[in-house]
């Protein structure tokens, strides 16, 4: 295997895991969406074909990014931030979908700028934190500028509104600040100051705090606010050990809302059983483990921070999504990376994974 890795010059385990998740995701997107596609568009392949286009684009992006020196991305860090910011502002000029302004649309395709914002924040923070390492213990010249940038992007995403996306960006930024070694007292104080803002956002809309109450006692709200979660429980229970078979699940037949997006893991549980669930968890664990090892053995601070951020960008939503569909966390609206329907998420995650693979190549050049 090491000989094979040296020939490819990349971490073959990580590459295999990413490709396995992506292609299995296409299989499950078809399984979970064909009924919805027929009802909405009269074509069972509508969602599948759209995602397939993003998959091909993602594969092309992976090939290009894997052979593009990751150090050169540093010069594009500010540009990515500007483009992401412009996208987050531009969404408010497009029509809302289900009450939210989250997408840019053109010619039948749509793009979610908050997905790009996650990567932009990681790239910019990795570049800047590595360059300004000697100033990070100070509040005003160290932590404050990053908190200001983070607050601006998180605030825009919350206005869409997209609490899950805002939470992801915030956690990724804080994790990188912690990893870089900022003063923990200042970071903790900033976190404490952010709590009232989060509570206000939670209480500002009835459906948000109702979801929280329903999470605490889902069976009491099984007909309304916890309906989706209860249907997820039923999918897990119906799947048993081996599942009911690919395409044979019942919960996706308009019982489980968002079966092809936020709750695709529930359909995997029903159709592939607990063995399938554990296999998916194992592949994500492999991605996280390999990503962490790449970050630890990276050649410099910038590469290490970038690898850690990308690993968290993939691993954190995966863990949160699985916790949500199993009732361990309140509903957040986060998709499962590489598996859920969502071209923006797939495209950005594949591109970011390719950069992670490029960083891993340094280990095999020695």
Residue ranges and their predicted role:
Residues 15-23, 27, 31, 37-228, ...:
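Hydrophobic alpha-helical transmembrane segments of multi-pass inner membrane proteins, especially
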Residues 22, 31-34, 249, 340, ...:
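Short linear Ser/Thr-Pro motifs
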Residues 162-167, 244-249, 259-261, 330-332, ...:
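Transmembrane helix boundary and interhelical junction motifs in multipass membrane proteins
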Residues 1-9, 42:
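Cytosolic juxtamembrane amphipathic/interface segments immediately preceding
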Residues 1-2, 319-366:
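A juxtamembrane structural motif centered on a specific transmembrane helix
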Residues 107-117, 159-161, 240-244, 334-348:
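Glycine/serine-rich anion-binding loops at beta->alpha junctions
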Residues 214, 218-261, 265, 272-276:
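TM-adjacent membrane-interface loops and short helices in multi-pass inner/ER membrane proteins
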């Amino acid at each position: 295997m090491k000989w094979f890795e040296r020939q490819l010059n990349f971490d073959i385990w990580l590459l295999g895991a990413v490709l396995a998740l992506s292609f299995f995701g296409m299989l499950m997107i078809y399984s979970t969406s064909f009924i919805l596609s027929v009802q909405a568009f009269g074509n069972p392949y509508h969602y599948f074909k759209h995602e397939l286009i993003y998959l091909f684009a993602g594969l092309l992006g992976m090939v290009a990014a894997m052979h593009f020196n990751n150090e050169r991305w540093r010069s594009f860090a500010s540009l990515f931030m500007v483009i992401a910011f412009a996208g987050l502002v531009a969404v408010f000029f497009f029509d809302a979908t289900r009450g939210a302004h989250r997408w840019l649309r053109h010619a039948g395709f749509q793009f979610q700028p908050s997905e790009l914002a996650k990567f932009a924040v990681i790239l910019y923070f990795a570049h800047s934190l590595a360059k300004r390492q000697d100033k990070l213990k100070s509040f005003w010249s160290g932590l404050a500028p990053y908190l200001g940038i983070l607050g601006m992007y998180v605030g825009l995403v919350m206005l869409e509104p997209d609490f899950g996306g805002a939470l992801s960006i915030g956690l990724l930024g804080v994790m990188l600040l912690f990893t870089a070694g900022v003063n923990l007292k200042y970071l903790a104080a900033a976190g404490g100051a952010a709590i009232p803002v989060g509570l206000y956002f939670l209480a500002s809309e009835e459906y948000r705090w109702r979801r929280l109450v329903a999470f605490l006692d889902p069976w009491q709200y099984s007909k309304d606010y916890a309906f989706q979660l209860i249907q997820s429980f039923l999918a897990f229970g119906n799947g048993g050990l081996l599942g009911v078979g690919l395409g044979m699940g019942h919960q996706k037949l308009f019982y489980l809302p968002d079966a092809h997006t936020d709750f695709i893991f529930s359909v995997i549980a029903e159709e592939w059983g607990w063995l399938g669930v554990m296999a998916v968890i194992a592949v994500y664990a492999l991605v996280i483990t390999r990503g962490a090892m790449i970050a630890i053995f990276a050649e410099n601070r910038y590469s290490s921070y970038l690898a850690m951020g990308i690993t968290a960008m993939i691993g954190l939503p995966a863990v949160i999504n699985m916790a949500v569909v199993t009732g361990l966390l309140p509903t957040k609206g986060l998709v499962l990376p590489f598996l859920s329907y969502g071209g923006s998420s797939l495209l950005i995650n594949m591109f970011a994974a390719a950069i992670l693979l490029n960083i891993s190549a340094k280990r095999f050049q020695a």
